[in-house]
């Protein structure tokens, strides 16, 4: 404790996930410092993250040193929400904002398509 990032093998984690295609979801038990591993796991499809939580890393105990603080949980939650927004749908048509911007550019510089 804590797990060093150099001791984490993302390829091994993904290989284990791929060995069990019948599982409907997978997750990680993360004992590293910070939020990087949790975010990487989400990007690769993790449905759950197990991570210790504390309100004070100075409280005695073996897990507090590597436990997440409240602001780190909010950071991961925000990342998950943002990632979900970017990953939802299979839209190829321009958004309303892109269409409006195109009209401004075409109006100013002409249509060069």
Named regions from a protein language model:
Residues 1-113:
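Catalytic cores and adjacent flexible loops of soluble metabolic enzymes
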